Amino acid sequence: DCLLSRGLGDVYKRQGYVYVAQIAMGADYNQCVKAIAEAEAYPGPSLVIAYAPCINHGIKVGMSKAQTEEKLAVEAGYWHTFRYNPALKAEGKAAFSLDSKAPTGDYKAFLNGEVRYNALARFNPERAEELFAKSEETAKERYEYLNKLITLYGGEN
Protein backbone atom coordinates (compact mmCIF):
# COMPACT_ATOMS: atom_id res chain seq x y z
CA ASP A 1 0.00 0.00 0.00
CA CYS A 2 1.47 3.30 -1.09
CA LEU A 3 -0.03 5.00 1.97
CA LEU A 4 2.52 3.18 4.09
CA SER A 5 5.41 4.24 1.88
CA ARG A 6 4.91 7.98 2.05
CA GLY A 7 8.02 9.72 3.13
CA LEU A 8 9.25 12.51 5.32
CA GLY A 9 8.45 15.11 2.67
CA ASP A 10 4.79 14.08 2.69
CA VAL A 11 4.52 14.65 6.42
CA TYR A 12 5.72 18.21 6.05
CA LYS A 13 3.87 19.00 2.80
CA ARG A 14 0.63 18.25 4.64
CA GLN A 15 1.44 20.95 7.18
CA GLY A 16 0.84 23.47 4.42
CA TYR A 17 3.44 26.01 5.51
CA VAL A 18 6.74 24.15 5.07
CA TYR A 19 8.83 24.39 1.90
CA VAL A 20 9.72 20.81 0.91
CA ALA A 21 12.00 19.61 -1.86
CA GLN A 22 13.42 16.25 -2.78
CA ILE A 23 16.61 16.41 -4.84
CA ALA A 24 19.35 14.32 -6.42
CA MET A 25 22.22 16.47 -7.64
CA GLY A 26 23.54 13.86 -10.06
CA ALA A 27 20.13 13.52 -11.68
CA ASP A 28 19.40 17.21 -12.22
CA TYR A 29 21.91 19.79 -11.04
CA ASN A 30 19.67 22.72 -12.00
CA GLN A 31 16.71 21.33 -10.04
CA CYS A 32 19.00 20.85 -7.06
CA VAL A 33 20.28 24.43 -7.12
CA LYS A 34 16.79 25.81 -7.72
CA ALA A 35 15.38 23.85 -4.77
CA ILE A 36 18.14 25.01 -2.42
CA ALA A 37 17.74 28.64 -3.54
CA GLU A 38 13.96 28.46 -3.09
CA ALA A 39 14.35 26.86 0.34
CA GLU A 40 16.76 29.60 1.40
CA ALA A 41 14.43 32.35 0.15
CA TYR A 42 11.28 30.86 1.69
CA PRO A 43 10.17 32.92 4.72
CA GLY A 44 9.26 29.88 6.83
CA PRO A 45 10.67 26.45 7.63
CA SER A 46 12.27 24.56 4.76
CA LEU A 47 13.15 20.90 4.31
CA VAL A 48 15.38 19.69 1.49
CA ILE A 49 15.79 15.91 1.30
CA ALA A 50 18.66 14.71 -0.86
CA TYR A 51 19.49 11.30 -2.24
CA ALA A 52 23.16 10.95 -1.41
CA PRO A 53 24.78 7.54 -1.83
CA CYS A 54 27.31 6.58 0.82
CA ILE A 55 29.96 3.91 1.20
CA ASN A 56 27.43 1.58 2.87
CA HIS A 57 25.31 1.47 -0.28
CA GLY A 58 28.13 -0.55 -1.80
CA ILE A 59 27.96 0.98 -5.25
CA LYS A 60 29.58 -1.68 -7.42
CA VAL A 61 31.22 0.87 -9.73
CA GLY A 62 32.66 2.77 -6.75
CA MET A 63 31.93 5.97 -4.84
CA SER A 64 33.57 8.05 -7.55
CA LYS A 65 30.37 7.34 -9.52
CA ALA A 66 27.98 8.58 -6.79
CA GLN A 67 26.58 11.30 -9.07
CA THR A 68 25.86 8.70 -11.75
CA GLU A 69 24.20 6.51 -9.12
CA GLU A 70 21.89 9.39 -8.20
CA LYS A 71 20.92 9.78 -11.85
CA LEU A 72 20.25 6.04 -12.16
CA ALA A 73 18.11 6.12 -8.99
CA VAL A 74 15.88 8.81 -10.50
CA GLU A 75 15.75 7.21 -13.96
CA ALA A 76 14.76 3.87 -12.42
CA GLY A 77 12.06 5.46 -10.27
CA TYR A 78 13.80 4.55 -7.03
CA TRP A 79 13.96 8.27 -6.13
CA HIS A 80 11.78 11.14 -7.33
CA THR A 81 12.57 14.84 -7.36
CA PHE A 82 10.01 17.53 -6.60
CA ARG A 83 9.49 20.95 -5.02
CA TYR A 84 6.59 22.19 -2.90
CA ASN A 85 6.53 25.93 -2.22
CA PRO A 86 3.49 27.12 -0.20
CA ALA A 87 4.36 30.77 -0.92
CA LEU A 88 3.49 30.20 -4.59
CA LYS A 89 -0.01 29.02 -3.70
CA ALA A 90 -0.62 32.32 -1.88
CA GLU A 91 0.37 34.09 -5.12
CA GLY A 92 -2.12 32.00 -7.10
CA LYS A 93 0.66 29.98 -8.71
CA ALA A 94 1.33 26.25 -8.79
CA ALA A 95 2.77 25.21 -5.42
CA PHE A 96 3.95 21.72 -6.43
CA SER A 97 6.35 20.71 -9.17
CA LEU A 98 7.20 17.08 -9.91
CA ASP A 99 10.61 17.57 -11.46
CA SER A 100 11.54 13.97 -12.22
CA LYS A 101 10.01 12.37 -15.28
CA ALA A 102 8.23 9.03 -15.42
CA PRO A 103 10.76 6.24 -14.76
CA THR A 104 12.50 4.82 -17.82
CA GLY A 105 15.42 2.94 -16.25
CA ASP A 106 15.68 -0.69 -15.19
CA TYR A 107 14.65 -0.76 -11.53
CA LYS A 108 16.05 -4.21 -10.73
CA ALA A 109 19.32 -3.45 -12.50
CA PHE A 110 19.62 -0.34 -10.32
CA LEU A 111 19.08 -2.41 -7.17
CA ASN A 112 21.57 -5.04 -8.31
CA GLY A 113 24.16 -2.29 -8.82
CA GLU A 114 24.41 -1.86 -5.06
CA VAL A 115 25.89 -4.47 -2.74
CA ARG A 116 23.30 -3.75 -0.04
CA TYR A 117 20.66 -5.22 -2.38
CA ASN A 118 22.83 -7.53 -4.44
CA ALA A 119 23.92 -9.43 -1.32
CA LEU A 120 20.32 -10.49 -0.70
CA ALA A 121 19.99 -11.61 -4.31
CA ARG A 122 23.08 -13.80 -3.92
CA PHE A 123 22.06 -15.17 -0.52
CA ASN A 124 18.36 -15.74 -1.15
CA PRO A 125 17.45 -15.23 -4.83
CA GLU A 126 13.78 -16.17 -4.49
CA ARG A 127 13.16 -13.80 -1.59
CA ALA A 128 15.16 -11.06 -3.30
CA GLU A 129 13.06 -11.39 -6.45
CA GLU A 130 9.88 -11.12 -4.38
CA LEU A 131 11.11 -8.07 -2.45
CA PHE A 132 12.56 -6.35 -5.53
CA ALA A 133 9.24 -6.77 -7.38
CA LYS A 134 7.33 -5.39 -4.40
CA SER A 135 9.75 -2.47 -4.12
CA GLU A 136 9.38 -1.71 -7.83
CA GLU A 137 5.59 -1.76 -7.56
CA THR A 138 5.72 0.57 -4.55
CA ALA A 139 7.99 2.93 -6.49
CA LYS A 140 5.48 3.01 -9.37
CA GLU A 141 2.64 3.72 -6.93
CA ARG A 142 4.74 6.48 -5.39
CA TYR A 143 5.20 8.17 -8.76
CA GLU A 144 1.45 7.91 -9.43
CA TYR A 145 0.80 9.45 -6.01
CA LEU A 146 3.17 12.33 -6.75
CA ASN A 147 1.42 12.88 -10.08
CA LYS A 148 -1.88 13.20 -8.20
CA LEU A 149 -0.33 15.92 -6.05
CA ILE A 150 0.05 18.02 -9.19
CA THR A 151 -3.73 18.30 -9.33
CA LEU A 152 -4.14 18.66 -5.57
CA TYR A 153 -1.58 21.43 -5.10
CA GLY A 154 -1.76 22.89 -8.57
CA GLY A 155 1.54 22.16 -10.18
CA GLU A 156 3.45 21.05 -13.20
CA ASN A 157 5.24 18.01 -14.45
Task: List each language-model region with its residue ranges.
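Single conserved hydrophobic/aromatic residue that forms the stacking wall/gate
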Residues: 1-12
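Gly-rich Lys/Arg/Thr-decorated short loops/hinges at beta-loop-alpha junctions or inter-strand turns
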Residues: 13-17
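Short catalytic-loop micro-motif centered on adjacent basic/acidic residues
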Residues: 19-24
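Active-site glycine- and acidic-residue-rich loops that bind
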Residues: 25-33
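Glycine/aspartate-rich loop-and-adjacent alpha/beta segment that forms the canonical ThDP
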Residues: 34-130, 134, 144-148
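Short, amphipathic C-terminal "tail helix"
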Residues: 136-157
